[in-house]
């Protein structure tokens, strides 16, 4: 059984973290938490 290289482990870890942050951002923008977000364009009076 071969052991994986440290570089591969670090690359996979970084990939998982980036995918997690992206998923969290999409969930915050389009999921249930988006009701708490304010739209500055709607708040601006012309």
UniProtKB/Swiss-Prot annotation:
* Transmembrane parts of this sequence: 10-30
Task: List the cysteine pairs that form cystine.
Answer: none
Q: Where is this protein found? A: Cellular thylakoid membrane
GO biological process: one example? photosynthesis
One GO cellular component term, please give it.
Answer: plasma membrane-derived thylakoid membrane
The way this protein sits in the membrane is described as:
Single-pass membrane protein
InterPro entries on file: PSII_PsbN
Sorted keywords for this record are: Membrane, Thylakoid, Transmembrane, Transmembrane helix
* Chief localisation class: membrane
- Highest taxon of source: Bacteria
Report the family membership. Answer: Belongs to the PsbN family.
NCBIfam families (alphabetical) = PRK13183.1 (NF009650)
Q: What does this protein do?
A: May play a role in photosystem I and II biogenesis.
Q: What is this protein called?
A: Protein PsbN
């Amino acid at each position: 059984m071969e052991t994986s290289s440290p570089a591969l482990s670090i690359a996979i870890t970084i990939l998982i973290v980036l995918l997690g942050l992206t998923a969290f951002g999409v969930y915050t923008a389009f999921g249930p938490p988006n009701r708490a977000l304010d739209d500055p364009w709607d708040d601006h009076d012309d």
